[in-house]
Amino acid sequence: MKGLIIGLASFGLTSAAAVSSLAQPVARRGCLVSDEGAIQDPAIQYTEKTVRRQNFPSNFTVDVNFHLASTEEEADLITDEIVDAQWKVLHEAFARYDINLVLNSTERTVDNLTGSAFLINEGPDKGWVYHEEEYNTYLKATRKGGYDALNLYFFSSYSPGATGYCQWPTPLAETDELTFWKDSCQLSAMTMPGFTAEQGAFESWNLGHLAVHESGHWFGLNHTFAGGCSEPGDFVSDTPAQLTQIFGCPEGSDSCPNQPGLDPIHNYMGYTDDACTNEFTPGQKDRMFSTFFNFRRK
């Protein structure tokens, strides 16, 4: 799959449009980041050239800020042990690709609206109501660091069935204040390692790999199934084409038999089980470096 793709907003898909899907709870795992697979933009060609032309450092360091939001009933749910386990998974996953994540801060908020990710079921008349104004105010008060700082928000009660969402890197953050403040990843705490099924953990996605997946979007990676079997797919040349979302861990799966390679079921940017995912490709590493230094740290 050839080419590169950058920001959500730069493709005419605003962050508000993507987040609004929170108002419609889904039935199974759902990363709420849209599939940009078929969308073209001048930034693609620009970044494809720079990844060949520029000499990026062999490694780089990124400050990470954890934000833990719980409802009053679930105030003690996200324990320090769970946070430590999640951090270990996240740090080790990216360290293998010469991206050194440093935990800069961890802060907790106990509040029913915040802990519910600002999505409340207000009864049969109103249904699910997304409190966007309060959400924006919360982000402005809590987001830390510059545009090159990764802020991860874990919510004890998230949109039912959804697992997470993350912002793409975009040049709009340089001129639009709200785009900057919204630059973050949000996740269901039930994807963190250490929760049990009785506590509400996702059965197949509770080893902490969702934080790796969403952070991959923050670094500019698309889903492996973006674009299906057609070029340019996910805009990374060494990830085999994949027709659609794949669940479980079906070894030998080949949903695009006329394209080289088997389905990349072990890639962090797919939807297979946490126990199945363990890698990025060299091309994905190159793309993370390129998008980071072209859009996040110039």
Each language-model region and where it sits:
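Fungal secretory targeting signals
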Residues: M1-Q24
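Pan-zinc metallopeptidase signature
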Residues: T277-K298
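Extracytoplasmic/secreted envelope proteins and their assembly/folding machinery
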Residues: D84-W87, H91, S184, H209-V212, ...
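Solvent-exposed loop/turn segments at secondary-structure junctions
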Residues: A69-E72, E107-V110, S156-G161, T191-G194, ...
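Propeptide-to-catalytic entry region of secreted or membrane-anchored zinc metalloproteases
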Residues: V19-D148, F155-S156, F293-R296
